[in-house]
Amino acid sequence: MYLGIDIGTSELKALLINTQGEIVASNHATLHVQRPHAHWAEQDPERWWQACGEVIAGLRQQAAQTWSEVRAIGLSGQMHGAVLLDAQGDVLRPCILWNDTRSAPQCEALRVQHPEMMQLSGNMIMPGFTAPKLRWVAENEPEIFRRIDKVLLPKDYLRWRMTGRFVSEPSDAAGTLWLDVAQRDWSDELLAITGLTRAQMPDLVEGSAVSATLQANLASEWGLSASVSVAGGGGDNAASAVGVGAVNPGDAFISLGTSGVIFVVNDRLLADPQSGVHAFCHALPGRWHQMSVMLSAASCLRWLCNLLSVTESQLMDEMAQLSDEQRRHAPVFLPYLSGERTPHNDPDASGSFFNLRHETPRALLGYAVIEGVAFGLADGFAVLGDAKRQIHQCSLTGGGARSTLWAQLIADVLQLPIVTHPASASGALGAARLAWLADGGLESEVCLKPLEQARYQPDAARGSVLQQRLQVFRTLYAQQQQARTLLPD
């Protein structure tokens, strides 16, 4: 039995798989984001640990007969978050999350003062990444910065609580801007740019390797053997790739969760920092990946539903009743509720509706939102360069994958077949598979592609209409950039 734990932004999920790769139990706990100021997004790491305990307790009840057979644990988690510990292991401040954009001024300063940083890291300097967050802390909370003994990523904080060891792995570490991504090791030069050293970083192992074993007291508390190992694991998207079997060059998937991601596997580092496409290590040795990221995806629909006091399923049902003619004249939505990464790297981008009228029903607002997210994915797909020519179909994962309407819309916008899988295909499944690999499992047997739930073929006629609306979408963003120059600071 293998346990996979995934720290998302809105929930912590965990599941158990057996040696046939079947999921035998799953559980989750809700997490919340604190936004004390504009552009800020934070969470308390202690809440992650509490949520982990809650989820483990639930799994023990669900799998009471087999729980003690767990041999290894894998970890997956939201990337880029900065957990700062002092020499006593105390958390110095709330974790600054991946979608926090307060460090935009620090990014600009780093680009001007250290132009070599993008070439060394293989990635554009963006507010979501970890290094600019630490520059912000140094400038705005110097007392805290001076006390930093270790900087951990979210899943690696859980690992430390489980094992007492400070360890990370290359797929997650690549999102810090401190990693030599080609060499899969910390870069002393990149660390020095933000006033840090290798001693403040966790050790690195590959995602499919053993990082440590459970502390004896915790193993006893959880009802597990003290010999249970904890695999290196992976950043959320790299782990999800393992979960959907995207492990060979050209394999690709789209994640439609809080954020929106297009992920393509490479056999070597393919860096193009100016494009805004991320070039990171995969969670498996000897592989890398490219990734375009939009900061707000399914979270846009959640925002609208909260605003309208309607459930997502109810609004989706209403959207499904819209005619093609109604959709053709729907408002156009810019999904930049948290700024945007790929391709714009624009923390000040904002959401907006265009073409609202008195008679616009809420179903058309909902359609505009899911269409706007699909258009954001199209912008990210457009800058993937040569990698996109290798993609013949994409798996679709995340909460948004439950919507047949959204899946078909993405297929029509990208003109690419979209495949969905059972809801179990997730970062938690990938984490469990990485645990299995760390326990001696063979990649050819462990990292299988899950069963297809549905396949969505692109429709050329609908795609033609959507391309016209996509041009409106892109024009609106350009006009928004110009209009923002007229706003007061």
Each predicted region: which residue ranges?
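N-terminal glycine/serine-rich phosphate-binding loop of ATP-dependent small-molecule kinases
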Residues: 1-93, 119, 147, 219-220, ...
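Active-site core segments that coordinate phosphate-bearing ligands/cofactors
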Residues: 3-4, 104, 109-129, 135-167, ...
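Residue-level signal for inorganic ion chemistry
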Residues: 21, 44, 73, 100, ...
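Structural signal for short hydrophobic segments within the conserved structured cores
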Residues: 25-29, 202, 454
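Short beta-strand-loop/turn "lid" adjacent to the catalytic site in phosphate-handling enzymes
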Residues: 62-98, 124-128, 159-180, 203-206, ...
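A structural motif corresponding to the C-terminal end of an alpha-helix
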Residues: 193-200
